[in-house]
Amino acid sequence: MTTIRNEIEINAPIASVFEYYTNPDNIKESWPREIVKESENVSGQKSEEGSEMKVTGEYMGKRDDMLLEVVDKEQNKKLVTRQTQGPFKRWESVQEFQNGQKNYTRVVHTIEYELPTTGKIGNFLTGSQAEEKIKQGIQQAAQTVKQKLESKSV
């Protein structure tokens, strides 16, 4: 099991940051285009417990879909999604939101995953390659969200 953690402070109200981060449509807008191609809500209310979203990504030249289910949500505090179908043996994403000083919001995003031993992604990515790609993606996504929310271009 590999764990990747990213923290960022965004100069915006917690409600705005939570709303942007937890909208499935924004995943494709914030993650690097070479990793995430599409993202959309596929069942239930957007980002409510039990709802599912589909993220289409590209892993070392191979396109694949990941179905994620929202398994825990606390408004303006936390969103947990887990892969129910997709290229990873296991994938869980935990986004935590905390009120900071002077209208800042602290976001802690932790992804735990396990690569499969077979299949598309298992054949094309080594552990360190996958970790580097995911680390770059989570960092770039956080910076993109920060820029959008701080410039109010949402």
Where are these regions (language model features)?
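Hydrophobic ligand-binding cavity/cleft-lining segments
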Residues: M1-S43, E48
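Short, surface-exposed coil-to-beta transition loops
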Residues: T3-R5, R63-L68, K89-V94
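Beta-strand elements of well-folded, non-transmembrane domains
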Residues: I10-A12, Y59-G61, D72, P87, ...
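Short loop segments at secondary-structure junctions
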Residues: A12-I14, E74-Q75, G100-K102
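A generic structural signal for secondary-structure junctions
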Residues: T22, P32, N123-T126, E150
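Glycine-rich portal/gate segments that line the openings of hydrophobic small-molecule binding cavities
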Residues: S39-Q85, Y104-R106, Q139-V154
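Beta-strand/loop substructures that line and gate deep hydrophobic ligand-binding cavities in soluble
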Residues: Q83-Q136
